Amino acid sequence: MTDDKKKILIDYNAHTINAMRNVVKEVLKSIQNNTLPENHHFYITFDTNFKNVDIPSSLKNKHPEEMTIVIENSFWDLIIKDSFFSITLSFSNIKSKLIIPYNSLLVFSDPYANFHLKFPKLEYNKEIITRIDKNKENIINIKDFKKDK
């Protein structure tokens, strides 16, 4: 007898997505000295509304939902951390620092290598707000229990 409704206890999808994000992190580490291998260049699309994304307001106004950056010849101060990377790029001849969490990534592409990764758009911000709103119903103010003295 086979059970058609198996309970899968290992979230392979989440592990795969984490591995894909780790590929991006390792690739960026490999160019941290501001040197890309010949002909390689990266397109990175990210969710500009994602928690801890930090970009100048002028860029946020131009890209209210998503933004694609190109890492090619001119980039500075690439710093790789466990949960994000930061990079300085030039936009209209103005250098701007961007902080991009790996969880905000939507696309990573190296057209020269014909390598492309597409990530699901995470809805953490909406989930947290919904959870907080639901929990507000269960919050009791301590002032309601204090006796006046």
Q: What residues fall within each predicted segment?
A:
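Short hydrophobic short-linear motifs embedded
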Residues: I8, F119, N125-K146
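N-terminal recruitment modules of adaptor/scaffold proteins
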Residues: N13-I99
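Short acidic, Gly/Pro-enriched loop/turn segments at secondary-structure junctions
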Residues: P111-E123
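N-terminal, Lys/Arg- and Ser/Thr-rich interaction peptides
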Residues: M1-K7, N18
